[in-house]
């Protein structure tokens, strides 16, 4: 079962449906790490002043919004936190609209909604109502301190929440400046019939298991082949790291010996012998000193 990333309730009117939210997608792309080819050590990112090229310490970094070209308004962390919406743990439905009314470019991220044991029947009621009316629910919800516009729609036996982009984030089709050859095209009836016939000949069903990411498949096949041939590059360890490892091994050995001596109910015999030898050497040394005197 997918891990819940949010728990709360769907609210519309006086109805509350306790639910949990889980991601409907996962990132499965190839993750290329940057490496120093001389030692295979990972290469990280530095905070750099883009003008001077010098690295900047964290305490000297502030957040600002460019208000005019080259001029910024600086905001403190406290001011930014105060602007975050208050989390109510509620998916608050405020309207129901036709499912075909929302343009696809507004869709953002999908999530699955799962009811808890108390909310199963009401959850099913909302899902079935949306299915029969052809409507989707519009709602407000706060996720990870960010306010989102979202829609709820049925998907087989479940309900899906899809976050929507705010209108200010969506570019208008007017910006494409499509000319009359597109907007007022005079299409030949015979050409339309031929195109329609081609579409019908190529008609199929949605079969997601048949669609493959060929780039990822080829890269992973190449990785497996190289690994099988022993073409693996390990990070080179510095000498001081090896020294620390040796210290750890010695300490482990000492701890084991200490535990054995405790289990034996007395001092470690090796320690007793070493102590006796040390005392003997001390007495012998003292006797030689007196004779020389």
Curated annotation (Swiss-Prot):
User: What InterPro entries would the database entry show?
Assistant: Ku70/Ku80_beta-barrel_dom, Prok_Ku, SPOC-like_C_dom_sf
Q: Does the keyword DNA repair apply?
A: yes
Q: Which GO terms describe its molecular function?
A: double-stranded DNA binding
- Span list, region Required for dimerization: 216-229
Q: Spell out the Pfam families in the cross-references.
A: Ku
Which regions are flagged for Basic and acidic residues bias?
265-280
Q: Which UniProt keywords apply?
A: DNA damage, DNA recombination, DNA repair, DNA-binding
Q: Its GO biological process terms?
A: DNA recombination; double-strand break repair via nonhomologous end joining; positive regulation of ligase activity
Q: What does this protein do?
A: With LigD forms a non-homologous end joining (NHEJ) DNA repair enzyme, which repairs dsDNA breaks with reduced fidelity. Stimulates rNTP addition to DSB and end joining (ligation) of linear DNA by LigD, on 3'-overhangs and probably also 5'-overhangs and blunt dsDNA breaks. Binds both ends of linear dsDNA protecting it from exonuclease activity.
Quaternary structure, from the entry: Homodimer, may form higher-order multimers on DNA. Non-dimerized protein does not stimulate LigD ligase activity. Probably interacts with LigD.
Kindly provide the name given to this protein in its UniProt entry: Non-homologous end joining protein Ku
Q: Which organism is it from?
A: Pseudomonas aeruginosa (strain ATCC 15692 / DSM 22644 / CIP 104116 / JCM 14847 / LMG 12228 / 1C / PRS 101 / PAO1)
The gene coding this protein: ku
């Amino acid at each position: 079962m997918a891990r819940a990333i949010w728990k709360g309730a769907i609210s519309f009117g006086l109805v509350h449906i306790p639910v949990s939210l889980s991601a409907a997608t996962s990132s499965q792309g190839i993750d290329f790490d940057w490496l120093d080819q001389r030692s295979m050590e990972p290469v990280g990112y530095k905070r750099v002043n883009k003008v001077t090229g010098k690295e900047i310490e964290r305490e000297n970094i502030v957040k600002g919004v460019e208000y005019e070209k080259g001029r910024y308004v600086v905001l403190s962390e406290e001011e930014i936190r105060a602007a975050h919406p208050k989390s109510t743990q509620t998916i608050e439905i405020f309207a129901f609209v036709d499912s075909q009314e929302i343009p696809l470019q507004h869709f953002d991220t999908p999530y699955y909604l799962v009811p808890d044991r108390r909310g199963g029947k009401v959850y099913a009621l909302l899902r079935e109502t949306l299915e029969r009316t052809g409507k989707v629910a519009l709602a407000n919800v706060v996720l990870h301190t960010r306010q989102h516009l979202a829609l709820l729609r049925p998907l087989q036996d479940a309900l899906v929440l899809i976050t929507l982009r705010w209108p200010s984030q969506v570019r208008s089709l007017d910006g494409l400046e499509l000319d009359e050859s597109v907007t007022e095209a005079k299409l030949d009836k015979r050409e339309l019939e031929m195109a329609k016939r081609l579409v019908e000949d190529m008609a199929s069903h949605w079969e997601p298991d048949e669609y493959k990411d060929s780039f990822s498949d080829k890269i992973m096949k190449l990785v497996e082949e190289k690994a099988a041939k022993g073409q693996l590059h390990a990070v080179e360890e510095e000498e001081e790291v090896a020294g620390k490892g040796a210290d750890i091994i010695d300490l482990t050995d000492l701890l084991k010996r200490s535990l054995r001596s405790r289990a034996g109910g007395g001092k470690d015999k090796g320690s007793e012998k070493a102590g006796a030898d040390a005392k003997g050497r001390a007495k012998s040394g003292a006797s030689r000193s007196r004779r020389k005197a």
